[in-house]
Design a protein with these regions (language model features):
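Sec-dependent signal peptide recognition
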Residues: 2-10
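Cleavable N-terminal signal peptides
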Residues: 10, 20-21
Length: 290
């Protein structure tokens, strides 16, 4: 009998333990008027949020291609990493749905793929209405991996009034698949996807330049948005990242660019995101948001 009671108590304690962790993550249902559908956005709150009235800065963390809003919480080997980062830096983290292959721009052809508007307007408005956030650009940063890295750089360049900084890990900085180190069939599938969303490319040498991070370097120079991006030596996106780095050097845009060992995979991004949050903390502190 004692053994049964002990086991029951153990499971009860375990349940309380896991509930404590689960309580730190909300999942918002965000209505997108522009796309006429509801999209999910997990929100990771620091423990201190429950006590007090202070306002918190927010990092919007975008997932990659063929991913979903679940990725940042389910694919890291340390399932509590985002909770730890939220607590360590006293930051709210939001990991929204971004579509499977949207690349986070507003498609002129597909009304169901308007993710620039969703991320930069509808999502931000919902988060600001729901939580005690710093409702100003000085309290918002956008970042992401792969397709999400493209989204972070693209959206921040076009909406400097919303974000004070942007971060990218292995970002798709150029939509020209000839620069990607990928199999031919994968490149072909992405070319078809871009044609579906944007129409046939007008320039086959540098297609869809206005929808690429590398095509927005003049905006990046004019904007007061702090930039950090990194890529692994063996990453399939190393060439576009080096391209963006060289363009920003040429036009004199301040930025931090890092190359280190790694590939286009979660172990690299799990390591990279911890370094990026150090950068984000520095930016928020300089803004008076932390």
């Amino acid at each position: 009998m004692k053994t049964i009671v002990k086991v029951c108590c153990t499971f009860c304690c375990m349940g309380l333990f896991f509930n404590c962790f689960a309580a730190k993550v909300d999942t918002l249902d965000v209505q997108s008027t522009v796309m006429q559908k509801t999209l999910k956005a997990p929100v990771i709150l620091p423990d201190s949020y429950q006590n007090g009235e202070r306002q918190y800065p927010v990092v919007y963390l975008l997932h990659g291609g063929q991913g979903s809003y679940r990725d940042w919480l389910s694919k890291l080997s340390d399932k509590q990493l985002l909770n730890k980062l939220a607590n360590q830096y006293q930051i709210i983290i939001v990991t929204p749905e971004g579509g499977s292959t949207s690349y986070y721009f507003d498609s002129p052809l597909d009304k169901a793929s308007q993710f620039e508007t969703f991320i930069s307007k509808e999502l931000v408005q919902k988060v600001d209405e729901t939580y005690r956030t710093i409702k100003d650009r000085k309290g918002r940063i956008i970042a992401g991996l792969s397709m999400g890295g493209h989204g972070a750089m693209y959206i921040s360049a076009r909406h400097p009034d919303i974000y004070c900084a942007a971060g990218s890990m292995s970002g798709v900085m150029d939509l020209n698949t000839k620069l990607w180190k990928v199999p031919a069939d994968f490149a072909k599938s992405r070319d078809k996807n871009f044609a579906r969303l944007l129409g046939a490319p007008k320039d086959t040498v540098s297609p869809y330049r206005e929808y690429c991070a590398v095509g927005l370097v003049d905006k990046m120079k004019a904007n007061d948005v702090k930039l950090i991006f990194d890529c692994g030596f063996d990453d399939i996106m190393i060439a576009p990242n080096r391209e963006l780095h060289q363009l920003l050097l040429a036009n004199g845009t301040p930025h931090e660019y890092i190359e280190r060992p790694g590939r286009h995979e979660w172990p690299y991004w799990e390591n990279a995101v911890t370094y990026q949050f150090l950068f984000f903390q520095k930016v928020f502190k300089a803004n008076g948001s932390l």
